[in-house]
Structure formats: structure tokens, C-alpha cells
Amino acid sequence: MEWITALKKAIDFMEANLCNDISADDVAKEVCISSFYLQKGFAIVTGFSLMEYVRNRRLYNAAQDILKNEEKIIDIAYKYCYETPESFTKAFSRFHGITPREVCKNPSSIKTFVPLKITISIKGGFTMDKLE
């Protein structure tokens, strides 16, 4: 259960810091596990690397922000830690399949990537008596 707690804590930390420049080492320090083991365990359980998860969540949230139409695309790019608008547009297009400017015209094209929730369900482990 210690691993599950660590993974949940890692997810919470990443979610709280989507608008901050964080690294896998920052996440590992937060949960007190070596970066190597955390990255390996996270990838095994979720199918994503730590930073792939962060990137996907940022790009999903960025699309939601663009739909609200309250901020300029360049400001959203910087908000989610992209160094240039071009790098943001490239990552956004790869993830969503459309450019940030096309989002309002075609909101159904946005790829959904909601926060991970880790739950464990253990079933079985008991014997059944034979009915006679």
C-alpha cells in the first residue's frame, strides 16, 4: 500500500503544479522515493511516464482555457510552462490533432485527458463450502 500512497501523492503534486516548471526529480523528492523507482513504478501502473502525464494534463487544460476565450493563446502557452508559442503549438497539435487557433471552430476535436485516480479493489481470497 505504500506504493499506492506514493503514486497518489505524486499525482496530487503534479496536478497542483501543472502551471509550474517541475521535473520528475521534483515529484520524486515530494514523495520521498528515488526518481528512478518512481518513474519506473508510475509507468508500470499508469502506462505513462511522469512527464508525459504532466504534458498531457497541461495540454488538456490549455485546450479548456482556450475554449473559455478569456486569455490569449500566447499567455496560455507561458502559463503551462512552454518556452515559446511555437513549441506550444507543436505540442498542442501533436496531442489534439488541431492547432490552438482551431479549437474554438472545432471543440469536439479536443482530446480528453482527465486526472488519474488510483483505486484498488481486491476480491476473492475466501473458500466456498461445498453444498450437499
Write out the residue ranges for each language-model feature.
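Core residues of bacterial helix-turn-helix
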Residues: 31, 80-81
